[in-house]
Design a protein with these regions (language model features):
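A short, charge-rich alpha-helical start-of-domain segment used by transcription regulators
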Residues: 2-3, 10-33
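Conserved RNAP core-binding helix
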Residues: 25, 29, 40-60
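Cytosolic regulatory regions built on CNB/CRP/Popeye-like sensor folds
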Residues: 1-2, 7-10, 60, 66
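Short, aromatic/basic-enriched loop-to-helix "N-cap" motif that marks the start
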Residues: 43-44, 59-77
Length: 100
């Protein structure tokens, strides 16, 4: 039987580094969704940035009681990082427009 996201997160937090690969696999559709929306980025760079966000969110996560709680925490972290990157890109584009 396949482990749930909550079980994998608990294993990872308990020191099982291999669990990250399984978590990343489960979260891949969301990772690719946000990576694909970063139009000005190379696809692999965007994917790696979102995976790094996933990794950091797992390190910061204090506890994970349920599947929904884990998913919500990770989704929020990835979505916030995506928004930060978009805002940064817009800011950089505005700088370019004003200096030309």
């Amino acid at each position: 039987m396949e482990k749930t996201l909550a079980e994998l997160v608990r294993e990872y937090k308990g020191g099982n580094e291999k669990s990250f690969e399984k978590i990343a696999e489960k979260m891949n559709p969301m990772i690719m969704f946000y990576a694909g929306k970063l139009y000005t980025w190379e696809q692999e760079d965007a994917r790696q940035e979102m995976l790094l966000t996933l990794f950091c969110s797992l390190k910061k996560m204090k506890y994970c009681k349920s599947e929904g709680e884990c998913l919500s925490y990770i989704r929020t972290a990835v979505r916030r990082r995506y928004k930060d990157l978009v805002l940064k890109e817009l800011h950089n584009q505005n700088k370019t427009v004003h200096t030309e």
